[in-house]
Amino acid sequence: MQVTEINAEGLKREFKVVVPAQQLETRMQDKLAEIARTVAMPGFRPGKVPMTIVRKKYGGAVMGEILENAVNDGAGKAITDGGLRPAMQPKIEITKYEENSDLEFTVAVEVLPEIKTMDFGTINLVRDKAVVPDAEVDDALAKIAERNETSEPVKRASKSGDVVVIDFVGKVDGVAFPGGTAEGYSLKLGSNTFIPGFEDQLVGKKAESDVEVNVTFPEGYGNETLAGKPALFEVKVKEVRAPKAAAVDDELAKSVGLENLDALKTAIRDEISRELDGVSRMKLKRALLDALSDGHDFPVPPSMLEGEFEAIWKQVEADKEAGRQDPADAAKSEDELKADYRALAERRVRLGLLLADVGRVNEINVTQEDLNRGIMMEARRYPGQEHLVLQYYQKNQEALESLRAPLYEEKVVDFILELAKITDKEVSVEDLRKDPDEASADGEAAPAKPKKKAAAKKKAAE
């Protein structure tokens, strides 16, 4: 087998591979001899079938297998002998093959670039930090109290936010319809639980009032027999109840499983603190990625760039069609937009390659402990359903593997942050949560590079 490099342009490599006819024939004879040792055919004892008959019956299939193996071996040899790291699957084209002649084909491959990393110790970053305001803790307590509110009877007329206890019978064309009758139903006015217009007509009513509620079922109503039809509900208001917020005290804390009010306040403060730490981490990571992007300008494989751009552009077009276009994009021509998003795609690919290379060189790996921690973080996103999340990952290997990429990236980012110089800066909660793409209140400009598009598909290495 002869392998010759015929093109080396940028990250593209192309090789010509020639497999001599005699080598193919030798492989053919070896394989046919192996078959002949065990094959049974009418009129012959096992292992005694003439080779000419074996070749006639099995030669075509065997040669197909031999050619496939020869192509794979040739492509592998071209890559291995050249010490290449392919960026994508090689493209193979058979240029010449006839029976009893040499096999010739080409192998075209894009390789990963040689990456010379910057000195991470020269990176200077500012990490915004914020203290949890007491007002946010108080707001969270008020919301918990609101969720645990009760109600008490009142003698006045009902208003939005009250609960009315009602009996009702719904009729269409004077005939009661299935599911349109209830007794002692508690309805919170303003909750939009019922069809549009129903609750509004019960505002200003007192207990023991009889009310005729006229409404029209929406065209898209789930029950097709009622969709779009006018209806009359005969309603009896049995009771009007005003909401009464739960007291913010130890009993409220106990209702959510904590010992006392101080414990509840601590839990709330810790939760908000974790959220602020997450925002701080996100902004620090973005600043790091900006610095890494500015500090590296190696070429990226064209196919990877094109694939990333196509994925982004497909999402941009889908968002535009759905009415979710980024307002900043509306005034730009398609050519301008494509240039912007291609620059974004190139940044993503370059950063992805850089982080992968840093991880490879420094032998950073995702351990089982990392995966377990990632699963627990996912589970915390679904309070009350944690066990279902755990079961999902236990039974779904593909989903489990999908956690590896973001976990790997975070470990590489942590590695680089350990080497960078970081200065902590106390900021207000409002400034911490401010979108970094917007100019800050003191006039500081956002980074002069393609922004992350709200409407575009998000990737970790932005």
Curated annotation (Swiss-Prot):
Isomerase found in the keyword field: yes
Biased composition (Basic and acidic residues): 428-437
Signal peptide positions (record): none
Primary localisation category: cytoplasm
Transmembrane helix in keyword set: no
A cellular-component GO term for this protein: cytoplasm
InterPro entries in UniProt: PPIase_dom_sf, PPIase_FKBP_dom, Trig_fac, Trigger_fac_C, Trigger_fac_C_sf, Trigger_fac_ribosome-bd_bac, Trigger_fac_ribosome-bd_sf, Trigger_fact/SurA_dom_sf
Pfam families xref list: FKBP_C, Trigger_C, Trigger_N
GO biological process, one term: protein unfolding
Subcellular location(s) per record: Cytoplasm
The protein's role, per its UniProt record: Involved in protein export. Acts as a chaperone by maintaining the newly synthesized protein in an open conformation. Functions as a peptidyl-prolyl cis-trans isomerase.
Name of this chain's protein: Trigger factor
Record organism: Paramagnetospirillum magneticum (strain ATCC 700264 / AMB-1)
Name of the gene this protein is made from: tig
